[in-house]
Amino acid sequence: MKKKFFLSKKISYPVVLLAATLLNAVLGIVFICLSPDRVAVHFNAAFEADKLGSPWMYLPAFVLPPFAAVGLIFENVRKGQKPQNRKPLKIILTFIAVLIGYMGWLMLVWCGKVSEIGQKAEAPLYILVCVPMGMMFIIMGNYLPVIKRNGTLGIKTPSTLASDYVWAQTHRVMGKVWVVMGIGEILAALADTFAKTEFISFGWLAASIVGCLLYTSPSPRD
């Protein structure tokens, strides 16, 4: 009886997250049904609509977040993660679910109002898009160093998976790099917004991602 109570208590948060994301999905579908038949589904660097399509193209942003909650429930039931990894996993998956849902509503509320090619979204989208992405890198960067070696969460290369020392050093360095990436992305978004530029945010993001991939890619000796 005590074990059953402990299990139900442990999965209560993922269940609440699942219920919230499912409710969000239902509301998103309702608003999609109420949207115009043709809306902006792609923007150029100046946030001018360059492609129109069905508002149902926004649907993935509403149906994907529940899978994060399902993943948490699955991990809690099977106890696949080390105790030190469970809190980072919960925080990272929760933030990803919230970020994807937020992007869905951003597209639906602001971008969904744009119905003509060349029309610009009337919103500070550099701040609304790039600042949350910067926050994601900061949060994940703070938790990278505390993640212990495992096969599902973290930076997985042959060398990191083979050694606790290499794993710890890689995640310690990349944690700092991701925090710098996040801060830089937020500052770049502010620069693009107030300096009226159109490339700093995405240029910084692309360069940061490429740099991370190059750093974590296996070397020939791995």
Locations of the language-model features?
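Alpha-helical transmembrane segments
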Residues: 53-64, 123-139
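Ordered, amphipathic secondary-structure segments that act as subunit-interaction surfaces
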Residues: 74-117
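Active-site and channel-lining beta-strand-loop segments
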Residues: 29-59, 153-162
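Membrane-water interface of transmembrane alpha-helices
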Residues: 67-77, 139-154
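Membrane-helix boundary/juxtamembrane motif in polytopic membrane proteins
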Residues: 153-177
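Conserved small/polar residues in nucleotide/adenosyl-binding loops
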Residues: 215-222
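Select subsegments of transmembrane alpha-helices in polytopic membrane proteins
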Residues: 92-97, 171-179
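Alpha-helical transmembrane segments and their helix-start/interface "positive-inside/aromatic belt" motifs
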Residues: 8-18
